[in-house]
Amino acid sequence: MKKSNLKTKLLASITCLSFGVTGLANAGAHSEDVYGPFPVTLKGYSGDCTNTVSYSGQIARHVMHDSLKAASTKGSYDDMNAYYVGADGDMAILAPSSKDGFPIKQTLVNEISSPNLVGKTYKGTITAWPNNMTAPEVIDFWMMKAEENPKDVSVGLNYQQLLSKFIMGAVFYSQAVDNYLDEKMGPDSKPNDKPYKDGACYTGKEHSWDEAFGYWGAAAHSLLLTPEQNYNIAKRKDLDAADYNGDGVVDLKSEYVFSHAYYASSFDKGGKTTYLNDINRAFLDGRKLITSANGEKLSDAQRSELMGYVDIINENWQKVIAESVFKYAGSTYKSLVALETVGNADLAKEFDKYMKYWGELKGFSMALQVGKENIGETATKLNRMVGFGPMLLDETQIVGIKGMMGSDGKYITAEYEMGKIYSMNDAKLHMLKIQKLMIDQFGVEARANDMLAEMADLASKIGTSESAEND
């Protein structure tokens, strides 16, 4: 993959900050490494606005995703769907919610904004799931199935994990890299010398960039924190790190860490990668560049530099998702090994872990396919090796779906078709080949749960150096 020639310059500009966030807040200081505030640059604006940073709709969607994920374990389609399509009136924030030592400011989605997830979901066909459904149809199908059984042991599906990991890709990742950082960065789309919309105080480019940052999910002050501090915020553990303005509560609009930014921090705290820092730095420097245009159209040189920041964001964001695929392929492999020897007393517990890991693997692998880049043959290999469902103990797995579909594309009735395609050893080998694929195609570096050392021995036992993928 092509790397931006700005990367070296950007990484060289990163400085390690040793002072505490709480101290900054109490002193009323503002750091140049915080995303905002940014001044009004729009020519002719005469309103009261003084800060043009605005991405509350994106944060509300993160909250709706987290709440849908929480609702998915309860088995109510209507509750899940309300967080997916939006609802009139107040909607309680199910997650993230306050806990002892970590009070959160907002309790209602509408305190942040009133958007929906469905309208921003990738609209293309999903070849990683049976019957050529679109992404919204897949999500609706999973919510329908989750109402029947949130964890369906009969087919090995954990719908909470499938829904969460795929929605993060099909909404947040897709919207950011294939819309706001792509189409809306074009010279004739959302120009910088005009408001994003009538009455707005921010320009077209300013707001488009801010919305992409909102989908990324980092706190505005994430660059002031270590990866571990960012990680702990997402785990609701470190109020001092989260509470940048020192008011004693965590404002979800700017002080929390969501979605792929959280996963980036989880990899970076191992010390091998700097995904969160690199992406945040590129977002911040890109916003400063847009602001420096002072309400004028971006010059060719400015736009070229801006697209260099876009390249850094796209490359590293894709890697974060690929790292997640790598990690959960390793987790799934370890569960497959454990299931071969586990006693009856622990079988249900181990199988529950297996369902969770495979669901995360499947969701992230599908998310990898809805970005700006068509990953082509890599997607085909990935889909065949991951499958439509995890291999069960009788070596069967989902091979299709049969049922009745309404005119709206939603299934009225549906049941899974099961079949035997390959052996348990083949399934294990597939997980290792997925890890190798993530290294070869995306250059993943953190490599959590790396099990590749076992690949040669397993292939030898099967009697082939090739996987038994269903091709």
Language-model segments: what does each one mean?
Residues 1-27:
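Gram-negative bacterial Sec-dependent N-terminal signal peptides
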Residues 28-471:
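Mature extracytoplasmic or organellar-lumen-exposed domains after removal of signal/transit peptides
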